[in-house]
Amino acid sequence: MLKKTFAALALGTALISAGQAMAAEYKIDKEGQHAFVDWKISHLGYSFIHGTFKDFDGNFTWDSAKPEASKISVDLKTASLWSNHAERDKHIASKDFLDVKKYPEAKFVSTSVKSTGDKTADVTGDLTMHGVTKPVTFKAVFNGEGKDPWGGERAGFNATTTLNLNDFGIKGPGATSQTLDLDISVEGVKQK
């Protein structure tokens, strides 16, 4: 009886360990320009200002058999914002908006991933920005995974969300500019 119990326990442990081993760790490839954190905000209700954050880092775990077990963490330097207009960038970075001297970083850490289709999911997590942490849900799309030409393995995703700036204590420049659209595109390199 003891042998059967031990064998069952060993098999169970092996199966659990195998399941945990399937999730792989990926480092977001920002060095090769294969990852972007882009934003868009209304300009007076007439057009949109587009920009990006140039300095960020992050990682994620991914198992295509268990997408719900995935996790992601992204840190970005708020002073790295760029909108192709130096004076506007200075103004956005100032105390009037992001106050990057007081709040130099923003961070997103996922708390849950819920599949919504074959290649789509809702990724919910805590976004800390401007000294405020709020739950945010991104609509994510799995783009694909596989080997790269350099002998590594990669996986790629896009994710979008809309933020209400007032929720983070940031006053937009007017009633038409209280929401910010975020569009994140990442390609991760599997870590060995």
Curated annotation (Swiss-Prot):
Main location: periplasm
One cellular component (GO) term of this entry: periplasmic space
Subcellular location: Periplasm
Keywords: Periplasm, Signal
Pfam families named in the record: YceI
Top-rank lineage group of the source organism: Bacteria
InterPro entries: Lipid/polyisoprenoid-bd_YceI, TTHA0802/YceI-like_sf, UPF0312/YceI
First and last residue of the signal peptide: 1-23
Family per similarity comment: Belongs to the UPF0312 family. Type 1 subfamily.
PANTHER family linked: PROTEIN YCEI
Descriptive protein name: UPF0312 protein PSEEN5043
Organism (species): Pseudomonas entomophila (strain L48)
Lineage, uppermost ranks: Bacteria, Pseudomonadati, Pseudomonadota, Gammaproteobacteria, Pseudomonadales
